[in-house]
Structures are given as C-alpha cells and as structure tokens.
Amino acid sequence: MYEVRLSNLAKEDLRRIYYYGAEHFGQQQADHYFYAFFSMFEQIANNPFLYQSVDHIRPGYRRCLCGVDSIYYRIDGNTVDIMAILGSQEPQPWLP
C-alpha cells in the first residue's frame, strides 16, 4: 500500500467542495461526499496504477473520478501525491 499525501491545493479543494455541498445539498450529503473522497484515496493507495494516466494534461499525472469531481495525483516512489480535486473546470490552469 502506498502512502497518500494531500497537497495544500488538494486540501483547499476538499474544503471548497465540502462547503459548496453543505450550502447546496445539506450537511449530511456534504459529509457523505467528503468521506467518499477518503475512500477513493484508500483505493488509489491500494492500486495507484489502476486509474487513467493523463500525461496529455500533465506528465506523470493520473486521474480518478469521485462523483462529479476528478482527483489528480502522481506517484512518487512509494507515495501518492494528491495534487488537486477538480470539477468540470479545465485542469491545466489549476494543476501544479
């Protein structure tokens, strides 16, 4: 199993998604969706090569879908770095 690290940008993305969900869908649904991300992080840690490579967006990056959002990550040795969590916006300007 790989270690998972969240970038500061990914942490901010999680906060933004949570607050948006709480405001538009209620706290219970926001909690449910928030915890779904951590379930996906665990799945990524168990098999990070399972998910789609998106070298055309950023070399070395992969993408995993969680609901309507995309988790962008890269593998660094035995660590998975979660770089950003984006909705439908164009990823290039947002990815480090």
Task: For each feature predicted by the language model, list its residue ranges.
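Basic, Lys/Arg-enriched alpha-helical interface segments
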Residues: 1-57, 61
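Short glycine/serine/threonine-biased micro-segments
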Residues: 24, 65, 85
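Basic/aromatic recognition patch in beta-strand/loop cores that engages polyanionic ligands
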Residues: 49-79
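Enriched for short, Lys/Arg-rich terminal
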Residues: 69-96
